[in-house]
């Protein structure tokens, strides 16, 4: 159980000690407690049947407790509001009643449960061509933000890039980006045996780890990402020691950077008229329209 897991508690403790905000994904592939199955929930291999009412009942009870602990924007940046399938990325979702109607209902039930309980924290969902026919209307039109792993690789394909740009330009949704996981390769690409090594990528030409991570930065910026993680400890160390300029490049240009472009003040008797326009110097977007934020950041002027 999560509240008793020592590794979990240590991660949270260390993050708080270093002043780091938290982000969560709860995934079920191999992660569902045995008591859920003992209660009668069905399964297929390492995954539950996500449309099983017993599974959903147990999960929603967990989610009540989890949200009570973490529905706090001072502690948590965002929460993944889905987590189904392999790696929690929506691949191979297992259903008892394998129909489109059931699939759509499961997506709506899970994301809706997160949205209801995490009312103060940004909610996101992994963007995938596989379930887009459901998620466009049932998830993203409701304000949940797109999140995509595989930035800087061919896994992030042209179809998904098109969807993402639509969500950014038309629906004004900020993008949560995650760099491609190069299998914790600290050998700078010289170690054999990596099936999906960056040298074999079908979209980008990359021969060294420096090139692979630089591609990730550029790809994240081109796709208007608000975030780009430094991944696991080995890659994080590599970033800081070998590519500090690329780290700073994303810090400077990623996300949103709002500055006043023009301010004009006209005094009319006892009244003052302030005309102003602002420019975003970042490639991303302030997610102020997310339902959990509900435009909570408002512009004000102070007269001193």
Tell where the protein language model's regions lie, with residue ranges.
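Catalytic-core regions of glycoside hydrolase
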Residues: 16, 80-88, 93-234
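Active-site groove signature of glycoside hydrolases
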Residues: 29, 46-52, 62-100
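Aromatic-lined substrate-binding rim segments of carbohydrate-active enzymes
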Residues: 1-44, 103-122
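Short amphipathic, basic-aromatic surface patches that mediate peripheral association
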Residues: 278-292
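Extended low-complexity, serine/threonine- and proline-enriched intrinsically disordered segments
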Residues: 289-304
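Catalytic cores of secreted or luminal carbohydrate-active enzymes
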Residues: 212-263
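Structural beta-strand segments of beta-rich domains
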Residues: 270-274
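Short amphipathic alpha-helices and their capping/turn segments at secondary-structure boundaries
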Residues: 5-18, 63-71, 265-268
């Amino acid at each position: 159980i999560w509240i008793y897991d020592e590794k979990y508690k240590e991660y949270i403790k260390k993050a708080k000690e270093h002043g780091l905000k938290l982000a969560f994904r709860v995934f079920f592939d191999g992660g569902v407690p045995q008591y859920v199955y003992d209660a009668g929930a069905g399964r297929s291999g390492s995954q539950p049947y996500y449309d099983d009412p017993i599974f959903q009942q147990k999960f929603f009870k967990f989610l009540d407790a989890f949200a009570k602990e973490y529905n706090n924007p001072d502690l948590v940046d965002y929460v993944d509001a889905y987590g189904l399938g392999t790696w929690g990325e929506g691949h191979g979702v297992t259903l008892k009643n394998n129909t489109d109607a059931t699939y759509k209902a499961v997506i709506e039930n899970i994301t809706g449960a997160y949205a209801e309980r995490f009312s103060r924290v940004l909610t996101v969902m992994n963007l995938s061509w596989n379930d887009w026919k459901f998620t466009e209307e049932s998830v993203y039109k409701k304000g949940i933000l797109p999140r995509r792993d595989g930035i800087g690789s061919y896994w992030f394909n042209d179809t998904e890039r098109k969807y993402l740009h639509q969500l950014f330009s038309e629906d004004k949704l900020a993008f949560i980006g995650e760099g491609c996981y190069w299998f914790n390769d600290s050998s700078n690409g010289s170690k054999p045996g990596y099936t999906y090594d960056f040298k074999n990528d079908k979209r980008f030409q990359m021969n060294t780890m420096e090139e692979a991570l630089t591609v990730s930065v550029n790809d994240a910026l081109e796709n208007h990402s608000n975030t780009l993680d430094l991944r696991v400890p080995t890659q994080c160390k590599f970033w800081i020691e070998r590519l500090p300029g690329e780290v700073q490049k994303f810090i400077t240009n990623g996300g949103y950077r709002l500055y006043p472009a023009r301010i004009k003040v006209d005094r009319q008797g006892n009244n003052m008229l302030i005309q102003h326009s602002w420019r975003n110097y970042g490639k991303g977007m302030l997610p102020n329209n997310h339902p959990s934020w509900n435009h909570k950041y408002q512009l004000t002027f102070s007269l001193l």
